Amino acid sequence: MIRAYMRFPGGVSKTLTLSYDDGVEQDIRLVEILDKHGIKCTFNINGGVFAPEGTVYEQGKVHRRMTKKQCYELYAESGHEVAVHAYSHPHLECLPASMVAMEIFEDRKCLEETFGRVIRGMAYPYGTYNDTVVEVLKNSGVAYARTTVSTEKFSIPTDWLRLPATCHHNNKRLMELAEKFVGMEVSANPQMFYLWGHTYEFEANDNWNVIEEFCEYIGGKDDIWYATNIEIYDYVQAYNRLEWAADASRVHNPSAMSVWVKAGKHHSKSQIIEIKPGETAKLF
């Protein structure tokens, strides 16, 4: 029997991604931590509620949104992703479809104008949504939308518009899950660790050590691909577009990026193969 499994860039079997919401000042410290350990994050921003330029927050206020200028300076050339979080951070499931569409389009337009790129990712405000919201997203250029559901698992998503996470950073099992992920020997389907939260929570709970220890432990591993949400989404879609011969002896890559496959007639004889853009590769 022929077996073939997706592998991430370089042929690795695991990927890590983070997702943090609201565009708050504490994101600055998180970016410093992530960059130190080579970890990528998606930052979900509400384009309609940037802090006004010159804002001075009262002492003790924890949820401090950044100005548009601050957000640009932090994220624009950082290598991290910027994604939609709805224009005004509403409960989308409470709105009629027309207003949901407006919230998404206005946020996309604002962020695309600010950062000069196409914005296709999203996290649901408050983590709430319904089927109507999902249908609107399908027609609004949104590729994926993160929920607040935590599975404590590492499966690759199948429903990208109802995207769950592995866990929130306050999960008591965070380091246990990290150790399990790092120690995994993956022979079949690839694995993804997805962490989410809000950086102001680190200040509110006085627990920056949680994310510092996590990143120090899980960063810098040769067998983990550190990627943003959209990078993982795009890669999985490219893999799914591979065109296989009837007997799976050849495979054609019609996409614009290289794709890696672990393929073999038996697990013990599997090989990692890079299929370059436009290439038809012979596997056996």
Language-model-detected regions and their locations in the chain:
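C-terminal domain-boundary segment and adjacent tail
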Residues: 1-8, 112, 144-153, 179, ...
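Boundary/entry segment of secreted carbohydrate-active catalytic domains
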Residues: 1-26
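A short acidic, amphipathic alpha-helical/loop segment
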Residues: 5, 29-33, 132-136, 210-214
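Hydrophobic "anchor" residues on beta-strands that sit immediately upstream
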Residues: 17-18, 81, 224
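Active-site metal-binding loops of divalent metal-dependent hydrolases
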Residues: 20-23, 86, 199, 229
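A Trp-anchored, charged/polar loop motif used as the substrate-binding/catalytic surface
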Residues: 24, 168-184
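Metal-dependent polysaccharide deacetylase catalytic core of the NodB/CE4 family, i.e.
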Residues: 35-143, 150-167, 190-199
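Non-membrane alpha-helical structural segments and their capping/turn regions in soluble enzymes
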Residues: 97-102, 172-175, 205-208
